[in-house]
Design a protein with these regions (language model features):
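Bacterial Sec-dependent signal peptides at the C-terminal "C-region" and cleavage site
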Residues: 33-47
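N-terminal secretory signal peptides that target proteins for export/translocation
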Residues: 1-18
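Generic recognition of flexible, low-complexity loop/linker segments
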Residues: 69, 156-158, 213-214, 236-237, ...
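Gly-Asp-aromatic-enriched flexible segments
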Residues: 43-204
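Long, ordered, helix-rich scaffold segments
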Residues: 572, 588, 595-924
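Beta-propeller domains with acidic blade repeats across secreted/periplasmic ectodomains
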Residues: 195-614, 635-636
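Bacterial N-terminal signal peptides
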Residues: 23-35
Length: 924
């Protein structure tokens, strides 16, 4: 199989007429690489040649999700196998040609054994023996042994073998699309080259800009209105809203297959409503150039001369300066370089300014590493080089740094495509993450500093599909290794989707239930949601509510959302017929909607940033850019600001506003200590959390603050103490950890993982030995309680393998918990674990039903080089006997060279019902 060369592309375009986005690679996450998720109007198979055969539209509801074909070729020398989207858009349209065979007198040749002349797919690749993404071919849950996977719209040209007169087989909807809840395809076989022409959009989009708001379903108290649309802008990938209500837009035209559409480069636009009617009527180009092609993030700080605009455009992060305040860039600086693959949506995303004045951002799993403006690798505060090589970080990450790029921190890692990070007024971080397409695993995360979020195996880097002990029953949870110790739980899983922009709503214009909620865009299912968050043990729980549902306009592709100065929401709409495979179906359209209470007129509160008083007042704004501008202004007059902020801090009734004032005051020179002391005894648990975070930022006796808060009655405060212990060694720190472990409540996974984070040492070292010793000294037999067993399960110290094996021998520990403990052994020192397991297997006394489950798992973790005599040999034989006919049986026999069972391997390989994989390994 081959991919198209450049020389092929003109022919492909001739075949597919006006169809766009050819040659896409698999893997999607957001924007135009969104998860092949949502149906949208696309191409109609109106062709220059009539097909010999056309199927009915195949959907999830079609019996067996497939139909047969048997076509007389009529002497043709070539055939074209065509898949179109069935007329409802190309979202989720994964298609399979199942065991197609050319037949004739004395001729029978499988198509998969032939080389095709050309092959194209609108998303992913045309592949033999694999689906369009490279996964297993499956139709209606059944594996396809010999077939071709593709994705609508697709054309495959094949020469007919000599003597062949018929083509026979089946066609079907691949599970990769069907399992996302959508997908509809139509198949056709031609004997002349087809020309697929674009058709006029059907119901579901596009609609005229003026009709767009009526297509969105919003809560009954709210309304959607149009703030801006084409021709004022097109294809907004990301937005920010400044203190004057201007909307700053990354306008993307030069994206992937269309990367040369605009020779002068993509643009950073500034949209403004000059007459106050709630509709933008002016557009200005702040910057245009090839260096911002396919920019994915924008953040605006300042509201006049000296304005800074951070633009994320992999592999670079630029800071543009508007020195004179005329809304045109005067100069450009590089902040970070070599940060992600260019033209890829899994690379570097938008920046956000926290209430502490520091800058936050993230990248997905094509971000790879961060380098400074000179191209030198960044080393973070923990002493680790910031890259995804597994030492210790993997895949997507979340970051924090000073505005000059110094004091760099990795706050979380092992995400797939965490699209943006939102920081609330307490300094708590939130984001979404996209699954591998088709696995119903999109998630919302509370980012616990230092956390591993489980996209791949933390130690091996293997994907979630690789078999492992204590495997999660549901694929959406298995996708994130949620049963593994060391993986922070998800706040919420939202099913299939294509998550994009996110913010925290801290205004008062929307109804009360939205205050403090996350507002999130999911472009695949055409929806903007609110996630109403509440405390849950040491972490959080959330419930979802739709804020804007585009079910009536399938072109609605929300790419970002911001809170405007008046507290309304502004939603950027990429507006495109489909999502998937780095494709882009439209380059001319784009919208921005305003969502607000019914009848609420657009307004822009005025702030006087020229005075300290005015800047402090601006900290009450629901708009993030306004608050960032205020923080920057206050830092210029620290003495006057300190006096005024100290007075203001005692006045606000709103908890979040008070937190912002505290951050602003504590961030001034010499003011952190008093602010921390003031907040440590605050009645609001969130303010006590701010106290500790501020103490750490300013390095004002953070360990003293931890000692005080280690016995706090609030579990979230204690969690924050654990997180703060990360990288802090010594007897005092170990004693704090021991108190936290002793207070652990069984079943609180957030707290369990915080305790694990607390044992991470600097430079990828471990603090577990000191932590465990301090705890065991005070807990007595507490490590055997349900809560204590969770701490042991999470631990990774020198004592951990022995403690885990002792628990496995405990009759109070059931089979299910035993499997979790066995999985924990995979994260221990291998030599120490093997010794402990060898002793356990030799001496364990447990019911047969428990032994039959755990022995096969345990013996595979023993090093055969240490000898396998006596009782241990008996247990190994028993382990093999417990799993006959399975891969585990094969593995045990081969690992320990059980000669007495060698013949059983041969029998197993030849037995009916043995899977191909097991049969092959049995005789390997």
């Amino acid at each position: 199989m081959r991919r198209f060369s450049r020389a092929d592309r003109d022919s492909v375009r001739q075949w597919l007429g006006g169809w766009r986005g050819l040659g896409a690679t698999a893997g999607c996450a957001a924007l135009a690489t969104w998860a092949c998720f949502s149906p949208a109007p696309a191409a109609d198979p109106a062709t220059a040649s009539q097909p010999l055969w056309t199927s009915a539209v195949v959907t999830r509801d079609t019996p067996t999700r497939s139909v047969p074909f048997d076509v007389d070729l009529g002497g043709a020398t070539s055939v074209w196998l065509v898949v179109d989207d069935g007329g409802d858009g190309f979202g989720c349209d994964w298609a399979d040609w199942v065991d197609p065979v050319f037949k004739g007198s004395g001729v029978e040749k499988a198509l998969v054994d032939l080389d095709w002349k050309r092959a194209s797919a609108e998303w992913g690749e045309v592949r033999k023996g694999k689906n369009a993404e490279g996964g297993e071919l499956k139709v209606d849950g059944k594996a396809v042994a010999r077939g071709i996977g593709t994705h609508a719209n697709s054309v495959i040209e094949v020469a007919v073998p000599a003597g062949a007169t018929r083509l026979v087989g089946r066609v079907g909807l691949d599970d990769g699309g069907a399992n996302q809840g959508l997908g509809s395809v139509r198949f056709a076989i031609h004997t002349k080259a087809p020309v697929i022409r674009p058709k006029r959009a059907q119901a579901g989009g596009p609609v005229a800009p003026a009709d767009g708001p009526a297509m969105l379903v919003v809560p009954e108290e709210l309304e959607a209105t149009l703030f801006a649309a084409e021709p004022l802008l097109s294809s907004p990938s990301d937005i920010d809203v400044d203190a004057s209500g201007r909307v700053w837009v990354c306008e993307v035209t030069n994206y992937r297959g269309r990367k040369d559409t605009r020779p002068d480069g993509d643009r950073i636009l500034v949209l403004e409503d000059t007459d106050g009617d709630g509709v933008a009527d002016a557009s200005k180009v702040f910057y245009q150039g090839r260096d911002v092609d396919s920019a994915l993030g924008i953040c605006v700080i300042g509201d006049g001369p000296g304005r800074k605009v951070i633009v994320s455009c992999a592999p670079d992060v630029f800071v543009f300066h508007d020195d004179d305040g005329d809304l045109v860039a005067d100069r450009k600086e590089s902040l970070f370089t070599k940060t992600g693959d260019p033209q890829h949506d899994h690379s570097v995303h938008a920046f956000s300014v926290g209430p502490d004045g520091r800058w936050y951002f993230n990248f997905g799993n094509t971000g790879h590493a961060v380098h400074d403006s000179q191209g030198k690798p960044i080393v973070d505060r923990m002493g680790n080089v910031v890259n995804d090589g597994g030492q210790p970080y993997r895949q997507g990450m979340v970051f924090r740094c000073n505005p000059d790029g110094t004091d760099f921190e990795v706050l979380g890692h092992n995400f797939r495509n965490n699209y943006e990070v939102a920081v609330d007024s307490y300094g708590t971080l939130w984001q979404s993450d996209n699954d591998d397409d088709g696995n119903q695993g999109v998630r919302i995360n509370f980012v616990m500093e230092g956390g591993n979020y489980g996209y791949v195996d933390e130690h091996t880097g293997q994907g979630w599909q690789v078999p492992r002990t204590n495997l999660e029953a549901e694929v959406p949870k298995r996708h994130w290794h949620l049963n593994d110790p060391g993986v922070v739980p998800n706040l919420l899983q939202t099913g299939a989707g294509s998550p994009t922009g996110i913010c925290v709503y801290e205004g008062s214009l929307l109804p009360e239930r939205f205050r403090g909620s996350l507002i999130h865009c999911d472009a695949g299912p055409n929806v903007v949601r609110a996630y109403h968050v509440k405390a849950d043990g040491a972490g959080y729980a959330a419930a979802a509510e739709n804020v804007a549902d585009g079910a009536a306009d399938r072109w609605f592709r929300p790419s970002d959302v911001c809170v405007a100065p008046d507290g309304s929401l502004l939603v950027a709409d990429w507006y495109d017929p489909g999502v998937g495979g780095h494709g882009m179906g439209d380059v001319e359209k784009g919208r921005i909607y305003r969502i607000a209470p019914q009848g609420s007129a657009w307004s822009v509160p005025k702030h006087d940033f020229s005075t300290v008083t005015g800047a402090i007042a601006a900290l009450a704004s629901p708009n993030l850019s306004t608050r960032a501008t205020a923080l920057e202004r206050l830092a210029k007059e620290p003495e006057a600001a300190a006096t005024a902020l100290a007075a203001a801090l005692g006045r606000p009734a709103d908890s979040r506003h008070a937190a912002r004032l505290a951050w602003a005051l504590g961030g001034l020179p010499g003011k952190a200590a008093a602010t921390v002391k003031r907040l440590l005894d605050a009645p609001d648990a969130n303010h006590r959390i701010v106290a500790l975070r501020l103490a750490r930022m300013a390095d004002i006796d953070p360990l003293g603050a931890m000692e005080k808060l280690a016995v706090d009655p609030d579990a979230a405060v204690r969690r924050e103490v654990a997180v703060a212990l990360r990288g802090v060694a010594g007897v005092r720190a170990d004693a704090v950890w021991a108190k936290l472990a002793e207070a652990h409540v069984a079943g609180d996974r957030w707290d369990t993982e915080a305790l694990g984070i607390a044992a991470q040492g600097p430079g990828n070292t471990s603090l577990w030995d000191g932590r465990l010793a301090a705890w065991l000294a005070i807990t007595g037999d507490g490590w055997k309680t349900p809560a204590g067993r969770e701490v042991v399960w999470r631990s990774r110290g020198g004592l951990s393998p022995k403690l885990i094996c002792d628990l496995l021998a405990d009759p109070q520990v059931g089979t299910s918990e035993s499997l979790a403990l066995i999985r924990s052994l995979d994260f221990q020192d291998k030599a120490a674990a093997s010794v402990a397991i060898r002793d356990l297997v030799t001496n364990i006394d447990a019911p047969d039903e428990k032994l039959q489950v755990i022995l096969p798992e345990l013996v595979m973790r023993i090093d055969p080089a240490g000898g396998t005599e006596g009782k241990l040999a008996e247990r190994i034989a028993a382990a093999a006997a417990a799993v006959p006919g399975t891969q585990s049986f094969v593995d045990i026999v081969q690992r320990f060279r059980l000669q007495s069972r060698a013949a059983d391997l041969v029998d197993l390989a030849a037995a009916d019902g043995t899977t191909d994989a097991v049969a092959v390994s049995a005789i390997a």
